Amino acid sequence: MKIADIQVRTEHFPLTRPYRIAFRSIEEIDNLIVEIRTADGLLGLGAASPERHVTGETLEACHAALDHDRLGWLMGRDIRTLPRLCRELAERLPAAPAARAALDMALHDLVAQCLGLPLVEILGRAHDSLPTSVTIGIKPVEETLAEAREHLALGFRVLKVKLCGDEEQDFERLRRLHETLAGRAVVRVDPNQSYDRDGLLRLDRLVQELGIEFIEQPFPAGRTDWLRALPKAIRRRIAADESLLGPADAFALAAPPAACGIFNIKLMKCGGLAPARRIATIAETAGIDLMWGCMDESRISIAAALHAALACPATRYLDLDGSFDLARDVAEGGFILEDGRLRVTERPGLGLVYPD
């Protein structure tokens, strides 16, 4: 079960539905695809989608971290020593979380294939399936409502709405959306760090009035002090995203009084399944719910996140829609989307079907 070859390439993915969030617009993305082959013929897959605005990792830095010459230490290593390999990934690539994540998930894929089981079973399944949200970017009211109707028609019952920080615009969109949905879907909101303290208090009043599920990352990432100054009831409705990169952040956020009630884990922020599961353990111990999110990603890494999410008892929310709007992808399988719910396949490993 020794590693015989590692190949990395860049794939360009146009989006079928470009969108805007508080700090940028997104029309296309690049992912790095990782293939790790063992001497006995197994193929493990990983994908990296670095997000410079969140982690500081550029596509160029990610590519450099995955340069073939820098991965020589993995050649000949036994995949069954997975915990040690993941530990070494963190030591060798500390500033490249997306690169680490791609290698980490490919190694997990291989180990689960070696054992002949879906990865979620190796990790310890806690859920069979969960509903995922789909994201509506920042756009005019009528376009927001039209997109919401499209998602409802496709069976989705959880919508995440991006906010811009302009209260008049944000509140009008949310009120009109509430009227249009008429109880047919749950709404959660994501200001992407665009609110200040007074604005958040006004937003929270609207959240309670409209029955909105929670608020994701209202404040700038460094303002944990603003979060802790909020009443406990409001903090419980806050999900930390940009404030939560790795396990150290999770530990700090969970320290009493907990700064939030929900952790949004993303493999591209934390560096893969191994650190994600450490974050999950901290959350479960502290009584914090888990949300599993993503960047715009190939279904390879979405599948990896889903396997991890379904193996954590504290998982309450999924926001794993990152591959839905790709105009094309490099793999199939990995998960099944049905009536807005995600479940993994019964194939071993990540369950992906890949043209070899």
UniProtKB/Swiss-Prot annotation:
- Any single GO BP term: amino acid catabolic process
Q: Which UniProt keywords apply?
A: Isomerase, Magnesium, Metal-binding
Per UniProt, the cofactor note for this protein states:
Binds 1 Mg(2+) ion per subunit.
Spell out the molecular function terms from Gene Ontology: magnesium ion binding; racemase and epimerase activity; racemase and epimerase activity, acting on amino acids and derivatives
Its top-level enzyme class, in one word, is isomerase
Cofactor annotation:
Mg(2+)
EC number(s) given by UniProt: 5.1.1.-
Q: Where does Mg(2+) bind?
A: 190, 216, 241
Q: Which residues bind substrate?
A: 135, 160-162, 266, 296, 319-321
* Functional description taken from the UniProt entry: Catalyzes the epimerization of L-Lys-L-Arg to L-Lys-D-Arg. Can also catalyze the epimerization of other cationic dipeptides, such as L-Arg-L-Arg, L-Lys-L-Lys and L-Lys-L-His, but with lower efficiency (in vitro).
User: In the UniProt entry for this protein, what further remark is given in the free-text comments?
Assistant: Part of a large, functionally divergent protein family. Was initially predicted to have chloromuconate cycloisomerase activity, based on sequence similarity. Protein modeling and substrate docking was used to predict the substrate specificity, prior to biochemical analysis.
Q: Which family does it belong to?
A: Belongs to the mandelate racemase/muconate lactonizing enzyme family.
Q: What is this protein called?
A: L-Lys-D/L-Arg epimerase
